[in-house]
Regions:
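N-terminal intrinsically disordered, cationic/polar leader segments
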Residues: 1-76, 81-132
Length: 132
C-alpha cells in the first residue's frame, strides 16, 4: 500500500513499486486523480490498440489490474475508469502517459509455487498468461 508522487506516470510508478519490492504475481487497485490520461481499446478484428488521450484533470473511479512477468520483469496490466468534472466516465486499458495528481494504491501479492509469465497468444494477438 502506498501513495504515488505527483507527476509520476501512473503505470510506470506501479511497475516500479513491484520491481522494487520483487512482486512478481498479484493484483493492484488504486484511486485518486490524474492530470490527464491515456487509455486504450483493443480492436479484436484488427488486433491493434487504439488510444484515447484525455487532456483534462480526471478522477480515478477505479483501477484494477494484475501483476505477472513479461520478459522476466514484473508487468502491471491494468484497466481504469475515470470521470471528468461533468461526471462523464471514460475507461480502458491504462497506458503510459497518465500523470498522477494524487494516487493511493494497494498491491496484494500472491504467494504461489510458480509465477505467471506472459507469452504471445497467436489466437488473440495479445501477450497473455498461459491457458489454465
Amino acid at each position: 500500500m502506498g501513495r504515488l508522487a505527483k507527476g509520476d506516470d501512473l503505470l510506470q510508478a506501479l511497475e516500479n513499486f513491484c520491481q522494487e519490492h520483487n512482486i512478481t504475481l498479484g493484483e493492484v487497485r488504486a484511486l485518486g486523480a490524474v492530470t490527464r490520461a491515456r487509455v486504450g481499446f483493443y480492436n479484436q478484428e484488427e488486433r491493434k490498440y487504439y488510444f484515447l488521450d484525455l487532456e483534462q484533470p480526471l478522477e480515478i473511479l477505479a483501477l484494477v489490474g494484475n501483476i505477472s512477468l513479461k520478459d522476466g520483469k514484473p508487468m502491471v496490466h491494468a484497466h481504469v475508469t475515470l470521470a471528468d468534472a461533468a461526471g462523464r466516465a471514460f475507461g480502458g486499458h491504462l497506458a503510459p502517459g497518465t500523470p498522477v495528481f494524487a494516487c493511493e494504491f494497494a498491491v496484494h501479492e500472491y504467494q504461489a509455487d510458480r509465477t505467471l509469465a506472459r507469452q504471445d497468444d497467436p489466437e488473440t494477438g495479445l501477450m497473455l498468461w498461459p491457458p489454465s
